[in-house]
């Protein structure tokens, strides 16, 4: 466990941070020699990372495995041994030069197939989503239909306020309201029927105020000719626009 932690710390500090800083200085100063040196190192270190990932799962049980990793990283980085430059020039450069065209073809095919694969997966995902949405809608509609069918006609008619206005049943007025309306043929004061052409005066609508006035009024009712003459002469009509105002005047009493 201790060996694993030490080897991991050495790889991170001396294998990645230190070369990264000197690569920055090579780019800043535009030193071609240093630039080429660190480019070769990063190519070799990328290959080392791939091999390390596989080896950690297979041969990590080998004695002194983590100590060998520390020694190999220092050998690659050391300016005295120049292990990265040696591995690149002796092995990697000839191998990559011979397989370069095939590697390029594989990369192009991988891009095309990857694009087609992504498009196919996208279409399948959209189809699955659409199918799920349609299925959910059909199930919900069926549930609503079954719920409505479960109601009986009595349950539907007991719901208040659901009927349209035109379909609501007519409710007749109570008999008390019908009887409370006065008959058009009866007079409000004496119960004497009037003809259609006769007009009611204000005195007839209000009724007499005493017994003497009632007797006088009855006497005037018996003499229709005298009433017609007196009321015709005694009434004054005042018009205000379209309104007709009739002046109240009490009938004269003759002895």
Swiss-Prot record:
Residues 158-242 are annotated as: Disordered. Expressed in circumvallate papillae. It is found in: Endoplasmic reticulum membrane. The keyword Cell division applies. The chain crosses the membrane at residues 1-21, 35-55, 59-79. One of its GO terms (cellular component) is cytoplasmic microtubule. One of its GO terms (molecular function) is microtubule binding. Disulfide bonds: none annotated. GO terms for biological process: cell division; endoplasmic reticulum tubular network organization; mitotic nuclear membrane reassembly; nuclear envelope organization. Residues 222-231 have a biased composition (Polar residues). The modification Phosphothreonine is found at residue 201. Keywords: Cell cycle, Cell division, Endoplasmic reticulum, Membrane, Microtubule, Mitosis, Phosphoprotein, Transmembrane, Transmembrane helix. Its main location: endoplasmic reticulum. It holds the Pfam family TB2_DP1_HVA22. Microtubule-binding protein required to ensure proper cell division and nuclear envelope reassembly by sequestering the endoplasmic reticulum away from chromosomes during mitosis. Probably acts by clearing the endoplasmic reticulum membrane from metaphase chromosomes. This is Receptor expression-enhancing protein 3. It comes from Homo sapiens. The gene is REEP3.
